[in-house]
Design a protein with these regions (language model features):
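A glycine-rich, hydrophobic/aromatic-adjacent loop/helix-cap motif
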Residues: 1-191
């Protein structure tokens, strides 16, 4: 039986986040590189109408929340760093529920690392949710940015620095609380 892996490049790099969605300990998260792609905050979520709405302390609800995305085309700063998480087809179905604004794509030939699964997939923003330029009133949730950076720091020396060097923050990071929760089981509620 061939092994299946997920290339995680954002919040799934955080062990706790991956484990929550998989419904089991995620196991070893092995650092790898995704070549011929770049990472950006280019996935947008309509904060006012989606399954989770966040509100800032002042009562302001930003219209758009940005999340990380990978796009084809490598940056001068180098390939996208991330992790490979081994999983089953059933677990991949759970990830599809979590990654509702993303399409699953095969990146097997673009991932470099040791002892890789025979098939590796990742998620890239669906056309409707892809924002090459941040919409007006877009923000990044501070809890999301901190979770991602915590995950990369835990991977070991140089991983957080590489993330920061290859991933610009295009808009403000804000503190916000979840005020509307229609989130499917296994999905993070902090972002």
């Amino acid at each position: 039986m061939s092994r299946l892996g997920l290339f995680g490049y954002g919040s799934l790099v955080l062990h706790e986040s991956a484990s929550m969605t998989l419904g089991r300990p995620a196991g070893e998260l092995r650092p790898v590189r995704l070549h011929d792609w770049r990472r950006r905050f280019s996935q947008r979520r309509d904060n006012l109408t989606c399954e989770k709405t966040f509100e800032c302390a002042e009562g302001w609800r930003p219209e758009w929340i940005l999340g990380l995305n990978v796009e084809q085309g490598e940056d001068e700063a180098g390939p996208v760093n991330g992790v490979v998480i081994e999983l089953t087809e059933a677990e991949l179905d759970r990830l599809d529920v979590r990654e509702v604004r993303y399409d699953r794509v095969d990146v097997t030939g673009s991932v470099r690392g040791e002892d890789l699964p025979q098939r590796i997939v990742t998620y890239t923003a669906k056309p409707f949710h892809f924002a090459p330029e941040p919409p007006e009133d877009a923000v990044i949730l501070r809890t999301y940015a901190e979770a991602v950076e915590t995950g990369f720091e835990a991977l070991g020396p140089g991983e957080l620095e590489h993330f920061r060097a290859t991933t610009p923050y295009p808009v403000e990071r804000v503190e916000a609380a979840l005020v509307i929760d229609k989130i499917p089981s296994g999905n993070p509620r902090a972002w």
